């Protein structure tokens, strides 16, 4: 028996199993992690939505507003640094080319600088998240069919992406405890 936390669509592809229902959709996200000199109008918030950003992102978050340990040790005492993540959504699996990522990163840094969120970026690190948000077609039975097919082969799906559901960290921890308890007696 196997406990699996990989995204359901990837697990189905890896195993070669198929079901009758069409696969449910998902969204991918490009995350720009930015270490920067804090600008004069850098918000104190954990994150903000910007659906009208010219460079195309939808959310900007401030790691260092959540916890200063997201800053380099040398910058924690100074109030002049900020660590940021910037998210841009894409249709599932439609990863941009390296040239597109580079152009987007430059445009995003320029926009954040114009807004006064940052003075200058010191580090920009893009990360592609293939399965970031999962969805279900109305009336879909794909998740149930796929989960049953995998269980028939001893593969038990736990966690947000494996179960193709939106859930928080507490739900994922609960799933882990339940799954571990069910294996304990066998």
For the regions a language model picked out, list residue spans one by one.
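Active-site-proximal substrate-binding core of FAD-dependent oxidoreductases
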Residues: 122-128, 183-186
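C-terminal helical "tail/cap" subdomain of flavin- and related membrane-associated enzymes
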Residues: 116, 124-126, 147-151, 167-170
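Mid-domain catalytic core of redox enzymes
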Residues: 1-110, 114-115, 120, 145
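Residues at alpha-helix caps and immediate loop-helix transition turns in enzyme cores, especially N-
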Residues: 100, 104, 138, 142, ...
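FAD-binding beta-loop-beta segment adjacent to the flavin cofactor pocket
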Residues: 68-78, 129-164
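Conserved beta-strand scaffold positions in the cores of enzyme catalytic domains, especially
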Residues: 121-124, 155-157
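A conserved FAD-binding loop/helix module that cradles the flavin
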Residues: 157-185
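Generic C-terminus detector
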Residues: 33, 111-112, 149, 157, ...
């Amino acid at each position: 028996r196997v406990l699996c936390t990989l995204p359901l669509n990837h697990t189905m592809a890896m195993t070669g199993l198929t079901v009758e229902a069409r696969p449910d959709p998902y969204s991918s996200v490009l995350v720009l992690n930015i270490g920067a000199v804090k600008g004069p109008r850098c918000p104190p918030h954990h994150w903000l939505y910007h659906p009208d950003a010219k460079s195309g992102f939808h959310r900007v978050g401030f790691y260092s507003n959540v916890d200063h340990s997201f800053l380099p040790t040398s910058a924690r005492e100074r109030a002049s640094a900020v660590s940021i993540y910037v998210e841009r959504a894409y249709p599932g699996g439609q990863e941009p080319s390296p040239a597109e990522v580079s152009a987007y990163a430059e445009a995003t840094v320029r926009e954040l600088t114009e807004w006064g969120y940052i003075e200058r970026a010191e580090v920009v690190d893009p990360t592609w998240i293939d399965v970031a948000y999962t969805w279900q077609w109305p009336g879909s039975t794909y998740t149930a069919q796929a989960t049953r097919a995998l269980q028939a082969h001893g593969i038990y799906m736990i966690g947000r992406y494996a179960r193709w559901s939106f859930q928080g960290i507490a739900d994922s921890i609960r799933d882990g405890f339940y799954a571990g308890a069910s294996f304990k007696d066998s």
